[in-house]
């Protein structure tokens, strides 16, 4: 029995050797030729795959170091030569600040009669002071204190004139189907409408 196993193993070994010879030399009967053609791409894929795996393991390291040096160069450019970066960064931020200040000036001119309305002087000074250093993002610290306190007071004290002007601007006065805006009035209106609708039906019945 052991001899039979040894013979089968040796036969398998010779089969493997002949199979390897068939792969390397493209020799053998036509049946083995089909197997060779089927396994040849796999064998061809395994060798370059191993080589690519080694190269792939080696390639990211130079790429990573290259990227690191590139980022370090960018950081060095940002920190060593900030004038170019600030000039590039100043263009869109300046236009955005200009548009925002123009919008605020329009809003302020609408409410100039308001006692807490801001004058154009502190806001313009705040916008100019913010535009001087656009790279410093916390602009609330750089704004002057009167404008900041006026903004806080404006947001805290909202009177009915401001609310009615907003309602008129948004056209909410023309919309009658918003009970959450006029909740106190609509409750009584609903009761009176309900009673007035029920009375004619009671009379007709």
UniProtKB/Swiss-Prot annotation:
Protein name: Cbp/p300-interacting transactivator 3
Annotated InterPro entries: CITED
Keywords: Activator, Nucleus, Transcription, Transcription regulation
A GO CC annotation given for this chain: nucleus
Function in brief: Acts as a transcriptional coactivator. Enhances estrogen-dependent transactivation mediated by estrogen receptors.
One Gene Ontology term from the biological process aspect of the record: response to estrogen
Family: Belongs to the CITED family.
A Gene Ontology molecular function term of the record: transcription coactivator activity
Pfam families, alphabetized: CITED
Domain of life: Eukaryota
Localization per record: Nucleus
Species of the source: Gallus gallus (Chicken)
């Amino acid at each position: 029995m052991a001899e039979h196993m040894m013979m089968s193993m040796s036969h398998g070994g010779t089969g493997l050797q002949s199979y390897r010879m068939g792969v390397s030399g493209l020799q053998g009967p036509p049946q083995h030729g089909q197997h060779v053609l089927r396994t040849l791409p796999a064998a061809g894929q395994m060798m370059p795959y191993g080589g690519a795996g080694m190269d792939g393991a080696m390639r990211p390291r130079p790429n990573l170091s290259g990227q690191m040096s590139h980022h370090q160069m960018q950081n060095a450019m940002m920190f060593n030569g900030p004038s170019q970066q600030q000039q590039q960064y100043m263009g869109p931020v300046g236009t955005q600040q200009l548009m925002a200040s123009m919008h605020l000036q329009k809003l302020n001119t609408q409410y100039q009669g308001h006692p807490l309305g801001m004058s154009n002087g502190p806001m313009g000074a705040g916008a100019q002071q913010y535009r001087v250093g656009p790279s410093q993002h916390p602009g609330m610290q750089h704004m002057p204190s009167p404008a900041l306190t006026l903004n806080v007071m404006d947001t805290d004290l909202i009177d009915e004139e401001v609310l009615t002007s907003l309602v008129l601007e948004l056209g909410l006065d023309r919309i009658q189907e918003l009970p959450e805006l006029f909740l106190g009035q609509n409750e009584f209106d609903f009761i009176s409408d309900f009673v007035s609708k029920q009375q004619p039906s009671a009379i007709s019945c």
